Amino acid sequence: VDYAYHALALDEHRKDFAPAVWTVRKPENVEVEQRWFVGAHSNVGGGYRDDPLPNLALAWLQQKARAAGLGFKADVVVNDQAPLANINDSYSEFMSGLYKRFKGDKRYYRVFGRGVNETVDDSVWKRWQARPDYRPPTLSGVASLRR
């Protein structure tokens, strides 16, 4: 493996969907990046109809794949307003709300910085700047570095 890229959902709060962040040190000459994106699991990976959020991660992965020599018939189109799109509350919606009823309101917040080469996508900071109500606890330790 010469390249390894991992898109992570910053706003997924189901502990059962905790990301498998890569923590093993990378070998020499292997490019690794794990990037956090706005949204819950299916917002980042795709799964909701008419949702612009998955295109953020897909465009990033396409860019990385193209840089590694892969070709594409078309580029992913990312709307400038995509980072401000609705984030689905997968915690409350999952299993028609049964998940939240069973687990209670014990939302899980991801931990940033324990993995190999973790980065935060610019779309997260765009949303942070535009939406004063968007302050993921996961980023509390790194947000001051970004401003």
What does each model-identified segment do?
Residues 1-147:
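Active-site- or binding-pocket-proximal scaffold segments within functional domains
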